[in-house]
Structure formats: C-alpha cells, structure tokens
C-alpha cells in the first residue's frame, strides 16, 4: 500500500504550524509517524463489562476514547504530546491532556463524561513507545477484542474536532 500524507494545520496565536506525517495501514490499525514519534490507533467495540478492565490495562502510553473520528484523536494526541514537550499542558498526564483536547473542555471529569471510554465503538491510541502498533495489537489481544475497520471521517466532523482540540490552546 502506498503511504498517504496528511497535513494538519493548527492556528496558535496567529501562527500556523503544519504537522506532516505518514500514515501506514497495518491491518485496520493506522501507524502514524510524527516529529514527536510514532502513534498507532485502532477501533474496537467494548462491552460494558470489559470497559473497566480495558482502562486498568491501558498504561501511560495508551488512551481509550469514544470519539467517532480517528483523525481528531490523532490530532489531539499530537497536540497533547507537543503541549507536554513545551510545558503548556493543562492536565497532569498526556492521557488527560488528550481527553481535554478531544472534549474541548478544561476539566478532566467533564472530558470523561463527553469522550471517555464507554460501551460500543471506541478508539485506542498508543504513543511514546518504539513500536506502538505492536503494543496496541498486544493490548487488544490481551482483552480478547477484535479490531473494527477505521472508516473515513466526515470532513465537517474533522474540522469541528480540530477546532475543539486547538481551542484548549486559547483557553
């Protein structure tokens, strides 16, 4: 498969930054190479009885969210990692920062209500490890889950998600 290249633009106080990364499909997972390291994302269906176990097994390099669009999760993760690397984070952890940016709010408890893991389709993203897709595959396997296909995101939904993730910079 030929790699696809995407640009995410983020307006931060009048400056436009472009994140160029390569997206490589592995099964239904996506591995994303960024200047902040590799990320890997997959979609799974969680039963209500497996949510707590999944959250407990999800370490500091993993986040599970109920977002509809994988592109907004990727963007929020990149912004969260960047915020931590520059000392502009609001949350105490990258996982928390991802939640805040996806939900577009400043309180973790509110973000969990809006975008936290729940019964049904969820996205799991791994970051901060040398082979995030291998870690993600092992995580999914350990829970006895099956990957679901990642479908293209609606363009308007992507824009709204990017705006929510970026608005945290201005708050």
From Swiss-Prot:
Listed InterPro entries: CGI121/TPRKB, CGI121/TPRKB_sf
Highest taxon above the source species: Archaea
Keywords: Cytoplasm, tRNA processing
Localization, UniProt: Cytoplasm
A Gene Ontology term for the protein's cellular component: EKC/KEOPS complex
Pfam families: CGI-121
Main location: cytoplasm
Example of a GO biological process term: regulation of catalytic activity
Family statement drawn from the similarity comment of this UniProt entry: Belongs to the CGI121/TPRKB family.
Subunit structure, as described in the record: Component of the KEOPS complex that consists of Kae1, Bud32, Cgi121 and Pcc1; the whole complex dimerizes.
Known role: Component of the KEOPS complex that is required for the formation of a threonylcarbamoyl group on adenosine at position 37 (t(6)A37) in tRNAs that read codons beginning with adenine. The complex is probably involved in the transfer of the threonylcarbamoyl moiety of threonylcarbamoyl-AMP (TC-AMP) to the N6 group of A37. Cgi121 acts as an allosteric effector that regulates the t(6)A activity of the complex. Cgi121 is not required for tRNA modification.
Stated name of the protein: KEOPS complex subunit Cgi121
Species of the source: Pyrococcus abyssi (strain GE5 / Orsay)
